[in-house]
């Protein structure tokens, strides 16, 4: 049971107390993003957790798990609370708009880790082992898992468009990849637009559509708030082909460098780039969506990294 933003419980052991603290922390976070949960009871069951698990965390034997049990429980409960909100309160068509359910869920999971565990490594405590700590993969953060899985599937050419109806998705895309791609797409849009725009649109959609019958979708609210600034995003949801950008230095005069960035894809997208100089100092900027080629001039910086956050997989 819960009241306001507090959960009512009577911990009678250390385990119960730990769970109570975890439940309060995760519930209060979700409530801050989605508003008050208007139903008196929220059921968080082992059955629901097993039906929609945290892939990876719930499948590792305890002896080999790089995370402590408290974190695993916290992240699993967080996912259950978000899922309870989204599935119980909103008029989201679960077949047609599956990406909205899972995209919002993954977006909030990413946001939670950024807020509470920004330095958490993907391989947890194993990243400190002497035989591993100098390996490249030991530097991956926990939130890198979403783009790593996406990249693996994209490289095998079995990915599907983000907004595919649920009954058209293959098992791996249904369970893992499309939710991850959806969350990363929202993260990319949030970064591009700025001002926590996606979080604000999620909250607005939540407040306006809780426990009512409505044809309005999250994307309707998102488009209302941003208009043509997210026309590329609507197209990206339906895109079913490779994404491929390339960069080439075409001119260099003293400290002034000219780069040609080619869009070899069939879609116009904004592109995030990181510029670095000889001292490894860097700055990051966005190039507005373009479909073919664009030329940029930069002073002092002599190296460009495209798509540094890997919001989408490239060939």
Where are these regions (language model features)?
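Surface-exposed patches in mature extracellular/periplasmic domains of secreted proteins
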Residues: 39-45, 95-96, 119-124, 200-202, ...
